[in-house]
Amino acid sequence: MLLGFRRGRRSHFKHIIHGLLPAASVAPKAAVPRTPPPRSPNPSPERPRSALAAAILATTLTGRTVAIPQPRQRSRSESDVSSVEQDSFIEPYATTSQLRPRPNWQSEMGRRSSLPSFETLDYGDEEDIETQLSSSGKELGDVSAREDRGGHSDDLYAVPHRNQVPLLHEVNSEDDENISHQDGFPGSPPAPQRTQQKDGKHPVLNLKDEKPPLCEKPPPSPDITGRARQRYTEITREKFEALKEENMDLNNMNQSLTLELNTMKQAMKELQLKLKGMEKEKRKLKEAEKASSQEVAAPELLYLRKQAQELVDENDGLKMTVHRLNVELSRYQTKFRHLSKEESLNIEGLPSKGPIPPWLLDIKYLSPLLLAYEDMMKEKDELNATLKEEMRMFRMRVQEVVKENEELHQELNKSSAVTSEEWRQLQTQAKLVLEENKLLLEQLEIQQRKAKDSHQERLQEVSKLTKQLMLLEAKTHGQEKELAENREQLEILRAKCQELKTHSDGKIAVEVHKSIVNELKSQLQKEEEKERAEMEELMEKLTVLQAQKKSLLLEKNSLTEQNKALEAELERAQKINRKSQKKIEVLKKQVEKAMGNEMSAHQYLANLVGLAENITQERDSLMCLAKCLESEKDGVLNKVIKSNIRLGKLEEKVKGYKKQAALKLGDISHRLLEQQEDFAGKTAQYRQEMRHLHQVLKDKQEVLDQALQQNREMEGELEVIWESTFRENRRIRELLQDTLTRTGVQDNPRALVAPSLNGVSQADLLDGCDVCSYDLKSHAPTC
């Protein structure tokens, strides 16, 4: 039964290639250029090309994903071979349309998360990982077989950065397994295990040789376990009630945000209607002006307009490219790690002469794809190692329980003092305890499912809100552009109106013209003031929404961290409680045995003392009789001699009894000393375990510090990118100003320079908004 259960658990994680293929095929626009990279005519013989790098480069260039052929499997037993043959076989170099995922893979995709952030990945331990790879490659024969098949392992794109786990051969199992002794954190093995691996002695548990005694792990008493369960159930209920209250608060916040979004939509619709009315009025004015200004059409103005439109189009194209590059770079930097300095220096394959190609210098072209693949492989290996460790511990526990049951049955057979009624009562109590355990586990599973469902619903709502915010921002940008164009057209119309005034002095009266112009100016001022007020209100609402979005993201992250911490605390408390209960019961049994031994020794000594007193009384009585006989009858010497002989024999018997009592007392004292030594050894073991746990905590703290350093480096790179984009925008602005000033100096400079400057300032404002929104988006996940 144990082997079948283990094989069923292992079959879920056979092929991890299904989780990696969609990531390469989903990307809409790859960062790698379409043209293939230049190949050197004489490649170096030390570092041949990797099949993995070629496959990934082909997928990025053509868009057709290719399945990577599986490596040669290591030696397994018959049970593993049979389980592998039952699984599906992936043909080498098959497309993703031919690869259909299984339900097991779907369940695993549902369980696992996307990609870990910088806080959970320990990227700082790369040098330790490389040293472990070199040491484990010397010890294991299977790894050497893979290296012979794959060629040289020094290629950067072919060497995976995942931890290779040493093989530990179990004695009782039928097949070989990779067992990594990991305490809580899969990337940080403890120091004592490293010393054992260097000496060549792996920590193997011989299940047949080491038989724990009955007194080490007895079954827990029902009273203690019931009280502990009641306490834990009360604690968990309180925590879940607090989480429910927080969920209600978040739901209320989401409802208020939806109401505000609806109001924003209504305001945007009203603004669109007003803009449509303004456009209609402007069209009418344009038609009237065209009818009047057909005679005064100038080709220079048309040429300048074309140039300005071309510059605006080029500026928009550059903005879009910069935005896309920023988005792609932020996505890679949030999901994948950077190359270290040593890795970036050790990149070979560049031509020895001539300029260096740009597709090998930049981080965002090819290396992130390989690093992402290696990170996924690391995660899968760590998951396999943790599952194997859990299965080993489960097997050990089951075997211990079986041994304890066998010993208990033997004791029951030996001491048949237990009646059938007491045995039935014990069985009923055990059944009740098992039913209570099942009910509690079901309740915990239901609560965890509810928490997961609520978390997914919140994530969906947050994604919807972010999409709506993006749409609103895009609409506002479009409306701002339209407003800028309308203002430029209004200024052009004003200039034309002034020219028409000079031409048509005698046609229209000055007073009538002034009144019309004043009315138009007042209308324009009113409309501009209304638009400014509406724009200020919209900007204030957008800032409020962004602040609320940040607060919601922070609250969501805090809630997820609290849930994880609570789950970890529950597991730790349960483990500690189990261990303490087992230790208490073992100590109780040992104390009871010691008390029984002491009582038996006391009874034996009391019996010996009573015998000695009886013998002394008999001796005294005989001495009195002898004196009386000597005083009364001097002739009865023979009887006195016989009585003396009897007294000597009795004294010898008393001496023998005393010697036996002394020997038994020595045995009892020797046993007590042995028990004290056993207790001292156990205390030393517990102290070693405490030191080991302290060291593991130190390792985890170092990993967290390294993750924080990487986050700071990421922020520095983002600041550099922002400065570069700001400089490019400034350069484009200066070019626009120079071109517009050159072209506008000849005819009517005031009428042309002002609209161009207004357009540039508003474009700069749009650029600033884009950069601010990008900064918010890039810093939001890091928080």
Swiss-Prot record:
Checking InterPro entries in the record gives: CEP89
Which PANTHER family is this protein grouped with? Answer: CENTROSOMAL PROTEIN OF 89 KDA
Residues with PTM Phosphoserine: 50
Q: Where in the cell is it found?
A: Cytoplasm, Cytosol; Cytoplasm, Cytoskeleton, Microtubule organizing center, Centrosome; Cytoplasm, Cytoskeleton, Spindle pole; Cytoplasm, Cytoskeleton, Microtubule organizing center, Centrosome, Centriole
Chain segments carrying region Disordered: 28-49, 63-157, 176-226
Functional summary from the UniProt entry: Required for ciliogenesis. Also plays a role in mitochondrial metabolism where it may modulate complex IV activity.
UniProt feature, compositional bias: Pro residues: 34-45
- Reading the lineage from the top rank, the first entry is Eukaryota
GO biological process: any one? non-motile cilium assembly
Q: Which disease is it linked to?
A: Homozygous deletion comprising CEP89 and SLC7A9 genes has been reported in a patient with isolated complex IV deficiency, intellectual disability and multisystemic problems that include cystinuria, cataract, broad based walking pattern and deafness.
Keywords, comma-separated and alphabetical: Cilium biogenesis/degradation, Coiled coil, Cytoplasm, Cytoskeleton, Mitochondrion, Phosphoprotein
GO CC, sorted alphabetically, is: centriole; centrosome; ciliary basal body; ciliary transition fiber; cilium; cytosol; mitochondrial intermembrane space; motile cilium
Coiled-coil region(s): 234-333, 369-719
Name of the protein in question: Centrosomal protein of 89 kDa
* Compositional bias per record (Basic and acidic residues), positions renumbered to this chain: 139-155, 196-214
